[in-house]
Amino acid sequence: MKKSLLALTLLALPALAVSTAASAAEGVSYNYVEGGYTATNLDDAPDSDGWGLNGSVAIAPNFHVFGSYNQQDFKDINYGYDQWRLGLGYNHEISQKVDLVTRVAYEKFKGDDFTVGGVRFPGDDLDGYSAEVGVRAGLTPFVEGYAMAGYEDGKDFDGDFYGRLGAQVKFNPNWGITGDVKFADNDTQWFVGPRFTW
């Protein structure tokens, strides 16, 4: 139920931004929804993959809310997990085509329940937060890119710094294909899929 509600919310984001215009660098929009393939490569555990949804809505000239949800399953074992985050971002135009972006978010990780020797155990249920800063730019009329540095922490896991790189190739003003990679201490996370921008 929670998965369906979050997925529907992300898909409904375009309706929430009816009259809000963001003050953003040329070629950059904070009103979008995207979905696609996601994967995680871990140093000390099996890799996982699945699907994900991401979205953002400008709520004021320099502020946007954003969210993401992904569901992945580990390869070769019967175990999966859900991750989601919801946050607030601030964007400040530092040149005609470049924005400085800062974002903070609440994060949630929920692992599947599992059974060992006929005994059922609850999956991990972890809460945390993240903060990141970076730049986002319209590199050409058809290509947008970003680079971010961040930190995430939670009460049940150790904090970690990470880097994030991403780009979008635009087919027209509304549609494009986007890719994102996040590098952390123990894992690398990937996302690729179509984006609808308004």
Would you name each region that the model predicts?
Residues L86, G163-V169, N174, D187-W198:
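Outer-membrane beta-barrel "beta-signal"
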Residues T20-S23, N41, G52, I59-P61, ...:
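Outer-membrane beta-barrel proteins
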Residues V33-G35, G55, V65-G67, L88, ...:
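Membrane-embedded beta-strand positions of outer-membrane beta-barrel proteins
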Residues Y37-D43, P61, Y69-K75, D82, ...:
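Transmembrane beta-strands of outer-membrane beta-barrel pores
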Residues N31-V33, P61-G67, S95-L100, G111, ...:
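Repeated loop/turn-to-beta-strand initiation elements of outer-membrane beta-barrel proteins
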